[in-house]
């Protein structure tokens, strides 16, 4: 059976094995609101069990970009799924929505059940950390579309927030304080440039780079998930706005939160913790220092904008350092970055 299909480049038996291998990882993400199991035509989630008065659903989709190239070339597939989850759930968090469920799309040149299991395990790990059910997905074997060994992954997250708690940025006011939580490194943006710098400078990815980690370890460090920290802060303090510092860095992302004319963020980068990887990229890539803030997160992955009186509540809500990196000022700029 299925020999003709296999000869055309699609091995359905390898697909069956991959599904069996991923089941135990998917099952650890399940929530009581999920109806049915893996393999249904459609995935169902019972919103009535959330006991929310006026839930607003918030969705997001994203991929991992060319960070995948490094993962594939180094045969490290077990954390790239975490990146896919983080890129989606961190985005929807900015509205105050907590993730409910996640779907993934994995397209490959050829289904290798072992590699597929590693990738999906990463997705499941990210979902479990985010208290988000991996409710469904698609694994597509497309030999004519991808080179040997190559694959792509994308994710889709849905979360919910009470309508009266939905954060739009409209409450951001002059004098508000801009607070940041540390990133885990580069996260999942700017990797076309990262890879070019590595290639142009013939950097040794296996060389020890920082705190016993190799350079490869550092550049493949998975994107940090901010769900638990954001939930703790939202429960403890009045938050006027949030920002996921993703593609485009500070310069593109922070202004997105400012929907009221006449206000802009003033960022003091001297208060941002320095990470060795960004110094390396800036030096080896001969990148203008200001441009670095238009590409990378530079050490801060998630931002909260709060009134001055809420700052200590934010600090007390999480078991980590909270960095005061700026303030909201009046004027017609998009953003002002000081201390570069």
UniProtKB/Swiss-Prot annotation:
GO terms for biological process: 'de novo' IMP biosynthetic process; adenine biosynthetic process. InterPro entries: PurM-like_C_dom, PurM-like_C_sf, PurM-like_N, PurM-like_N_sf, PurM_cligase. Its EC number is 6.3.3.1. It is an enzyme of class 6 (ligase). The keyword Cytoplasm applies. It is found in: Cytoplasm. Its main location: cytoplasm. Pfam families: AIRS, AIRS_C. The keyword Ligase applies. CDD domains: PurM. One of its GO terms (cellular component) is cytosol. It catalyses: 2-formamido-N(1)-(5-O-phospho-beta-D-ribosyl)acetamidine + ATP = 5-amino-1-(5-phospho-beta-D-ribosyl)imidazole + ADP + phosphate + H(+). GO terms for molecular function: ATP binding; phosphoribosylamine-glycine ligase activity; phosphoribosylformylglycinamidine cyclo-ligase activity. Keywords: ATP-binding, Cytoplasm, Ligase, Nucleotide-binding, Purine biosynthesis. Pathway: Purine metabolism; IMP biosynthesis via de novo pathway; 5-amino-1-(5-phospho-D-ribosyl)imidazole from N(2)-formyl-N(1)-(5-phospho-D-ribosyl)glycinamide: step 2/2. Belongs to the AIR synthase family. This is Phosphoribosylformylglycinamidine cyclo-ligase. It comes from Macrococcus caseolyticus (strain JCSC5402) (Macrococcoides caseolyticum).
């Amino acid at each position: 059976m299925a020999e003709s299909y296999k000869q055309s480049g699609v091995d359905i038996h390898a697909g069956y094995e991959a599904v069996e291998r991923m089941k135990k990882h998917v099952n650890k993400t399940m929530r009581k609101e999920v109806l049915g199991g893996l393999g249904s035509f459609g995935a169902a989630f019972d919103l009535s069990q959330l006991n929310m008065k006026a839930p607003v659903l918030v969705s997001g989709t994203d991929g991992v970009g060319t960070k995948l190239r490094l993962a594939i070339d180094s045969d490290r597939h077990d954390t790239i799924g975490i990146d896919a989850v983080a890129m989606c759930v961190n985005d929807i968090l900015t509205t105050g929505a907590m993730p409910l469920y996640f779907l993934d799309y994995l397209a490959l040149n050829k289904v290798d059940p072992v590699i597929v299991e590693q990738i999906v395990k990463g997705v499941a790990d990210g979902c479990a950390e985010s208290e988000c059910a991996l409710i469904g997905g698609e694994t597509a074997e497309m030999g004519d579309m991808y080179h040997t060994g190559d694959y792509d992954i994308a994710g889709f997250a849905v979360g919910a927030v009470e309508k009266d708690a939905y954060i739009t940025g409209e409450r951001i006011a002059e004098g508000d304080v801009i607070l940041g939580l540390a990133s885990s490194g580069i996260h999942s943006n700017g990797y076309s440039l990262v890879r070019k710098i590595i290639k142009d400078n013939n950097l040794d990815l296996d060389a020890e780079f920082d705190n016993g980690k190799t350079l490869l370890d550092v550049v493949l460090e998975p994107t940090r998930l901010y769900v638990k920290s954001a939930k703790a802060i939202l429960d403890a303090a009045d938050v006027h706005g949030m920002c996921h510092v993703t593609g485009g860095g500070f310069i593109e992302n922070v202004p997105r939160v400012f929907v009221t004319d006449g206000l802009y963020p003033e960022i003091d980068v001297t208060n941002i913790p320095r990470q060795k990887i960004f110094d390396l990229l800036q030096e080896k890539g001969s990148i203008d220092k200001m441009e670095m803030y238009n590409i990378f997160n530079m050490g801060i992955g998630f931002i909260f904008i709060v009134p001055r009186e809420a700052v200590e509540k934010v600090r007390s809500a999480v078991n980590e350092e909270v960095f005061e990196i700026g303030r909201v000022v009046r004027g017609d700029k998009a953003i002002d970055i000081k201390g570069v």
